[in-house]
Amino acid sequence: MVPVIVIPVLNRYDLLERCLASIDYPVDTLIIIDNGGQASLWGCPWLVDHRQIDDYRIWSMPSNLGVATSWNLSIKATPYSKDGWLLLNSDAWFEPGALKHFHGECSPDTITLAGRPGWSCAHVGRNVVAKIGLFCENFHPAYFEDNDFERRAQAHGVPIVHSTAKVNHDNSSTIASDPSLAEANGRSFQANQMLYEKRWANGVPTHEEWDLDRRVELGWDR
């Protein structure tokens, strides 16, 4: 069973429906972060296959949290996840049997990637988060947060596993569906690239502040 799947979404809810329909392997908790605030998302309870998904959460946000913040929020909300977190793009989908295949290659000690680009379907092991912290939220709203995290992980000796599971992805469909987002991305992408280069100019960036082990040790909910 997959402990946690996290899917942020901003638009193209039709692709989210396709993504959900492709989940054909047991999942303990599914978290959908609705950064677009669309009422149509509330149709998701009827789209979730309750034979596969034990529990789900739909969080509708008043503004776009961005990718890194969405992932971090989900990790913070599920600190007891057994082996880690499966981070899935809303415009990605699994071929039959691919989710089981992918999960079988995941480990608490690794980052496991599938699809193209690899971070369209990524599993981040809990020991990886315990070692290097969360994603840098200054990369907003998208791009370079994954490059930065993967590079930090490699600098700390974390193995990167490239899965052979068949995961499909309509790359950049969020931006392609809205000219205003494409224009905004032209600005934010450049700014995020500059931040990435600045963060790595003098070696490995500092550890992100939030600490998984401390959260679990001091928590009142376990």
Please identify what each model-predicted range represents.
Residues 28-38, 59-61:
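Short beta-strand/loop segment that forms part of the nucleotide-sugar
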Residues 3-15, 19, 33:
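A conserved hydrophobic helix/loop-capping motif in glycosyltransferases and polysaccharide synthases
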Residues 124-143, 152-163:
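Aromatic-glycine-rich donor-binding/catalytic loop that engages nucleotide-sugar donors
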Residues 22, 34-47, 91-93:
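A conserved acidic beta->alpha catalytic loop
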Residues 97-114:
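Conserved donor-nucleotide/metal-binding helix-loop-beta segment in metal-dependent transferases, i.e.
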Residues 145-222:
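C-terminal catalytic/acceptor-binding lobe
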Residues 82-93:
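Short beta-strand-to-loop acidic/aromatic patch adjacent to the donor-nucleotide binding site
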Residues 61-78:
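Glycine-rich, basic loop-to-helix element that forms the pyrophosphate-binding segment
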